[in-house]
């Protein structure tokens, strides 16, 4: 299995998974801004894209999943009750799909959004905004369909994973090293909190510090309706 993070030098992470026996590939959380880069990489490496997977409906960027489905004929995979249109492969909690001989398993982890999932392959867990590495904590819960108490309660899903599993989150500062779940259990402040009240205080303070999401008014409608707007301010 080849596993690689593709978006160098930016905060939004995209992960490439390849079964080297069949040359089948999956992209997890591809970003529309880099669509051409993904296609170039797939073509230059002789890979067939089987799955474009979104860990949740994003508010900070436009997903490339529906364009990859349109252009390459792959499946667009999300949680079964997502409000995102364009999805043609819906998954349930603990469901597995196969990429060649590689099992890709989905673990429902709502809170940041109501459709959040952890995507697991052997050795790696792609957590979206459900869990970040170290002091970054977790994603904010004050965006559409986010719920603090639900997120807090969903942290119990982490008990399903081996401590040596590498946490590959949806956002990290460029150059951040992806660490193991066991390391995060000791060094991520959310995972050492004693109670929900502590978590609630952290979320409120984090939201105040972060402020608004500049791309939300463009990204959310695009991701719901699977349509690229005529004008994208940041492109």
Predicted regions located by residue number:
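Residue-level signal for the nucleotide or nucleotide-sugar donor/cofactor binding architecture
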Residues: 63, 145-146, 194
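Short, polar loop motifs at secondary-structure junctions
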Residues: 78-84
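Catalytic core of the metallo-beta-lactamase
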Residues: 1-49, 85-172
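Active-site metal-binding motif and surrounding structural segment of the metallo-beta-lactamase
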Residues: 34-77
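Short Pro/Gly-enriched beta-strand edge/turn motifs at strand-loop
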Residues: 1, 77-78
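Flexible loop residues that form catalytic
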Residues: 57, 172-173
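Accessory terminal helices/loops
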Residues: 153-166, 173-235
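Glycine-rich, phosphate-binding/catalytic loops in enzymes
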Residues: 43-45, 70-71, 143-144, 184-186, ...
């Amino acid at each position: 299995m080849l596993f690689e993070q593709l978006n160098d030098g930016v905060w939004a992470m995209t992960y490439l998974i390849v079964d080297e026996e069949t040359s089948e590939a999956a992209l997890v959380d591809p970003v529309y801004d880099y669509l051409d880069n993904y296609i170039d990489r797939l073509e230059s490496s002789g890979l067939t894209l089987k799955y474009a997977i979104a860990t949740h409906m994003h508010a900070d960027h436009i997903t490339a999943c529906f364009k990859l489905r349109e252009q390459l004929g792959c499946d667009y995979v999300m949680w079964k009750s997502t409000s995102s249109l364009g999805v043609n492969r819906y998954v349930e909690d603990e469901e597995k799909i196969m990429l060649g001989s590689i099992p890709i398993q989905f673990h429902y982890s709502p809170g940041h959004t109501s459709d959040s999932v952890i995507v697991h392959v052997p050795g790696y867990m792609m957590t979206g905004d459900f869990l970040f590495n170290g002091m970054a904590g977790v994603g904010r819960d004050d965006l559409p369909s986010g719920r603090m108490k639900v997120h807090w309660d969903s942290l119990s899903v982490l008990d399903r994973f081996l401590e040596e599993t590498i946490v590959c989150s949806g956002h990290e500062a460029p150059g951040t090293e992806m660490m193991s779940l066991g390391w995060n259990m000791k060094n991520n402040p959310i995972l050492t909190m004693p109670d929900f009240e502590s978590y609630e205080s952290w979320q409120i303070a984090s939201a105040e510090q972060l402020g608004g999401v500049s791309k939300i008014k463009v990204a959310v409608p695009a991701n719901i309706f699977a349509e690229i707007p005529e004008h994208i301010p940041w492109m």
